[in-house]
From Swiss-Prot:
Keywords: Glycosyltransferase, Transferase. Belongs to the UDP-glycosyltransferase family. GO terms for cellular component: cytosol. UDP-alpha-D-glucose binds at residues 273, 332-334, 349-357, 371-374. This is UDP-glycosyltransferase 76C4. The keyword Glycosyltransferase applies. GO terms for molecular function: nicotinate-N-glucosyltransferase activity. CDD domains: GT1_Gtf-like. It comes from Arabidopsis thaliana (Mouse-ear cress).
Amino acid sequence: MEKSNGLRVILFPLPLQGCINPMIQLAKILHSRGFSITVIHTCFNAPKASSHPLFTFIQIQDGLSETETRTRDVKLLITLLNQNCESPVRECLRKLLQSAKEEKQRISCLINDSGWIFTQHLAKSLNLMRLAFNTYKISFFRSHFVLPQLRREMFLPLQDSEQDDPVEKFPPLRKKDLLRILEADSVQGDSYSDMILEKTKASSGLIFMSCEELDQDSLSQSREDFKVPIFAIGPSHSHFPASSSSLFTPDETCIPWLDRQEDKSVIYVSIGSLVTINETELMEIAWGLSNSDQPFLWVVRVGSVNGTEWIEAIPEYFIKRLNEKGKIVKWAPQQEVLKHRAIGGFLTHNGWNSTVESVCEGVPMICLPFRWDQLLNARFVSDVWMVGIHLEGRIERDEIERAIRRLLLETEGEAIRERIQLLKEKVGRSVKQNGSAYQSLQNLINYISSF
């Protein structure tokens, strides 16, 4: 770690697994460059402060009822948090600035998740520089602002012959992907996106956990669109080992189990921290894994199967059969798993964090996106980078079995592994000295040091 530079940065993540982890990783990066770190966080999904003793954590009241904390409607949750947290955050920032003034310390800036829409005017009123931190792929963040226009232009229902047509204003999405995004979102969601766009353009800068090698065209176009400095500092976890900021407790028995498997023989299955499925879909995945006759490590998150606690829908005799070839856990140390020599493929929902982690470890993917940016990420994996196989939304045992066999056993899988190895090397070079992400990070450090 570099010597303290006397500057403090305040970070404010959204309280979701896919937002907290990258923000804590950013905190580690900035701390290693000499910045003191304060993390403001909600009571809901509070990060584990004891895991990061070098940071200062300040908890604010979020006003969520017990019922609201259990909602699976992410957009509703974010709306409620934005309504409830403005006043507590204002008071928290006011106290931090007053304390810094008394102690003759400089607070450089506020870095908050772009999903917090009240922080721009708040920071401006306190004369505090604000940067927006984004956990999406750059191309999705840039293009998703055209969704209101596409909603007006889309002629429904789609004809069968149109399903695979490209969406020219949102490449490389297909029309069937766009339809799923629009069906899951609402006109109110369009309004929220408009506010994010407005606040982004008013910010002092935008930080992405991506790099030119993954987002080159969108990066240059975004600089023109937003007219603010943009820093693509690379995959967050490539700067430091896995963060211990998970909201779930990983099953550490995964690693010794993987140690007993052959190289590149195991299919790892996880649909992330938010996606839910029904009992029929759970059974189709189970049968697909069983029929593939390949070893598997399957994460079934508690509460991820609608109507049940965990895997109660799978008959006991079938669980015994599954356990002969694979291992089912409630959560896994994903970065550690993907690094393991035994992993041959990743059946994923294609959240951006999971997608980038898979690329960085050279693990080819089977794409099963469910919502929002996952649909775009999956198209990049299967259609642009060609480092994965797309299930095209079909959660069917035969499709899953076939995809696993194609990836692990057939020559198609060998070609995919070669391509993802090349992509891994390109992204890896970006975070090393003189790489694009390394230079962007250095530019960010210099920029926030100048405030």
